[in-house]
Curated annotation (Swiss-Prot):
Protein name per Swiss-Prot or TrEMBL: von Hippel-Lindau disease tumor suppressor
GO molecular function: DNA-binding transcription factor binding; enzyme binding; molecular adaptor activity; protein serine/threonine kinase binding; protein-containing complex binding; transcription corepressor activity; transcription elongation factor activity; ubiquitin-like ligase-substrate adaptor activity
GO BP field: amyloid fibril formation; angiogenesis; blood vessel endothelial cell migration; camera-type eye morphogenesis; ciliary body morphogenesis; endothelial cell differentiation; extracellular matrix organization; eye pigmentation
Domain of life (superkingdom): Eukaryota
Record remark on domains: The Elongin BC complex binding domain is also known as BC-box with the consensus [APST]-L-x(3)-C-x(3)-[AILV].
InterPro entries membership: VHL_alpha_dom, VHL_alpha_dom_sf, VHL_beta_dom, VHL_beta_dom_sf, VHL_sf, VHL_tumour_suppress_b/a_dom
Topology within the bilayer: Peripheral membrane protein
Residue numbers spanned by region Interaction with Elongin BC complex: 123-132
Subunit structure as annotated in this protein's UniProt entry: Component of the VBC (VHL-Elongin BC-CUL2) complex; this complex acts as a ubiquitin-ligase E3 and directs proteasome-dependent degradation of targeted proteins. Interacts with CUL2; this interaction is dependent on the integrity of the trimeric VBC complex. Interacts (via the beta domain) with HIF1A (via the NTAD domain); this interaction mediates degradation of HIF1A in normoxia and, in hypoxia, prevents ubiquitination and degradation of HIF1A by mediating hypoxia-induced translocation to the nucleus, a process which requires a hypoxia-dependent regulatory signal.
Function: Involved in the ubiquitination and subsequent proteasomal degradation via the von Hippel-Lindau ubiquitination complex. Seems to act as a target recruitment subunit in the E3 ubiquitin ligase complex and recruits hydroxylated hypoxia-inducible factor (HIF) under normoxic conditions. Involved in transcriptional repression through interaction with HIF1A, HIF1AN and histone deacetylases. Ubiquitinates, in an oxygen-responsive manner, ADRB2. Acts as a negative regulator of mTORC1 by promoting ubiquitination and degradation of RPTOR.
Coarse class of the protein's main subcellular location: cytoplasm
GO CC annotations on file: cilium; Cul2-RING ubiquitin ligase complex; cytoplasm; endoplasmic reticulum; glutamatergic synapse; intracellular membraneless organelle; nucleolus; nucleoplasm
Gene name, Swiss-Prot/TrEMBL: Vhl
Length: 185
């Protein structure tokens, strides 16, 4: 039988702390309260205005100030904190160090950790949907002379909560296969 945590801090460190707390399950993807500082530099290497999103201890995305293209910002984060990055205008997903989730590690010799934010290689369909969304108002999508399924695709705007659900599912599948990257809890 698993041992109960003596304190909330200990519960944060215990495996399986996704268990029921206050009557609801804890989200799988959430920041861990490690209290181990990590200096990070967010580098926007994309042509888009970037919206950094920190997943708090309850798994809720918390927006941080935007980063214009070609700029960087020093962030005081912590080991075990989870970050996502989105286009500030369209909410299209962006990559950080070639992946979707960024988890700061400990600094080595006082050097900051770099989080390089870039555009992913979108599929042709995804990119076309982005362009049409930028040119056509949502109320006019169904006036376009296109196949019906594309109306639904256009109306299915990028959504960070859906992405978190998808990433959670991928995390659970990777965990079951024993392939989970270090630092993701």
């Amino acid at each position: 039988m698993p041992r109960k945590a003596a304190s909330p801090e200990e519960a944060e460190r215990m495996p399986g702390s996704e268990e029921i707390e206050a009557g609801r399950p804890r989200p799988v993807l959430r920041s861990v309260n490690s209290r181990e500082p990590s200096q990070v530099i967010f580098c926007n290497r994309s042509p888009r205005v970037v919206l950094p999103l920190w997943l708090n201890f309850d798994g809720e995305p918390q927006p941080y100030p935007t980063l214009p293209p070609g700029t960087g910002r020093r962030i005081h984060s912590y080991r075990g904190h989870l970050w996502l990055f989105r286009d500030a205008g369209t909410h299209d997903g962006l990559l950080v160090n070639q992946t979707e989730l960024f988890v700061p590690s400990l600094n080595v010799d006082g050097q900051p950790i770099f989080a390089n934010i870039t555009l992913p290689v979108y599929t042709l369909k995804e990119r076309c949907l982005q362009v049409v969304r930028s040119l056509v108002k949502p109320e006019n999508y169904r006036r376009l002379d296109i196949v019906r399924s594309l109306y639904e695709d256009l109306e299915d705007h990028p959504n960070v909560r859906k992405d978190i659900q998808r990433l959670t599912q991928e995390h659970l599948e990777n965990q079951a296969l024993g392939e989970e990257p270090e630092g993701v809890h």
